[in-house]
């Protein structure tokens, strides 16, 4: 089985080594194509106005000066040649990708691009606490990642579905189990704009997260609730975003 791995944290991110280790537990035909620089939050952006620069950093390890989407396209359509990958793994992201994160996440986008190419694709993310932000533990991802991917692959992944896996911020022996979840939703206002001043007194801004606003009680059955209860969250996400429930009503409204 040929596996293509990517991420959005960049070619030198610790989580990329973790995704490679997970991949090597499944196959010895593993290829790494990841962004040259950190691309967190770029979502499914595609580089159309700038050339892509490709650098081989080691055997079957390549850095692309572009987005995670660019990396998957470069890997599948150029680097791997005539033999497409059988599986795309994106991650392991430093930080969870749940609720509204899936819209912004480059990790999710890397897996989605694999799905667009008709390949079974997984996004894997490791939650961390404030105390472990600088050095999150990857042991939980290493323990549960291979078995989740293997079991889902054996059962088969629908063509337009990407599997979003999030590991809780705890040691492997503290994980209560695996649970299939739906995408959650945070309180409004979890994003904030932080205004600061530079040395000349000019304003500049950071987009950040208001942790206090996000500390609501998550709905049962969601990815947020699973992580809060120390479960590994496995969420199937569809590429087709059509609102089928509203489609019929919209047809009536528009006559």
UniProtKB/Swiss-Prot annotation:
<feature type="binding site">
    <location>
        <position position="9"/>
    </location>
    <ligand>
        <name>a divalent metal cation</name>
    </ligand>
</feature>
<comment type="similarity">
    <text>Belongs to the SurE nucleotidase family.</text>
</comment>
<dbReference type="GO" id="GO:0000166">
    <property type="term" value="F:nucleotide binding"/>
</dbReference>
<dbReference type="Pfam" id="PF01975">
    <property type="entry name" value="SurE"/>
</dbReference>
<dbReference type="GO" id="GO:0005737">
    <property type="term" value="C:cytoplasm"/>
</dbReference>
<keyword id="KW-0547">Nucleotide-binding</keyword>
<feature type="binding site">
    <location>
        <position position="40"/>
    </location>
    <ligand>
        <name>a divalent metal cation</name>
    </ligand>
</feature>
<feature type="binding site">
    <location>
        <position position="93"/>
    </location>
    <ligand>
        <name>a divalent metal cation</name>
    </ligand>
</feature>
<keyword id="KW-0963">Cytoplasm</keyword>
<dbReference type="GO" id="GO:0008254">
    <property type="term" value="F:3'-nucleotidase activity"/>
</dbReference>
<protein>
    <recommendedName>
        <fullName>5'-nucleotidase SurE</fullName>
        <ecNumber>3.1.3.5</ecNumber>
    </recommendedName>
</protein>
<dbReference type="InterPro" id="IPR036523">
    <property type="entry name" value="SurE-like_sf"/>
</dbReference>
<dbReference type="GO" id="GO:0004309">
    <property type="term" value="F:exopolyphosphatase activity"/>
</dbReference>
<dbReference type="InterPro" id="IPR002828">
    <property type="entry name" value="SurE-like_Pase/nucleotidase"/>
</dbReference>
<comment type="function">
    <text>Nucleotidase that shows phosphatase activity on nucleoside 5'-monophosphates.</text>
</comment>
<keyword id="KW-0378">Hydrolase</keyword>
<dbReference type="InterPro" id="IPR030048">
    <property type="entry name" value="SurE"/>
</dbReference>
<keyword id="KW-0479">Metal-binding</keyword>
<dbReference type="GO" id="GO:0008253">
    <property type="term" value="F:5'-nucleotidase activity"/>
</dbReference>
<feature type="binding site">
    <location>
        <position position="8"/>
    </location>
    <ligand>
        <name>a divalent metal cation</name>
    </ligand>
</feature>
<dbReference type="GO" id="GO:0046872">
    <property type="term" value="F:metal ion binding"/>
</dbReference>
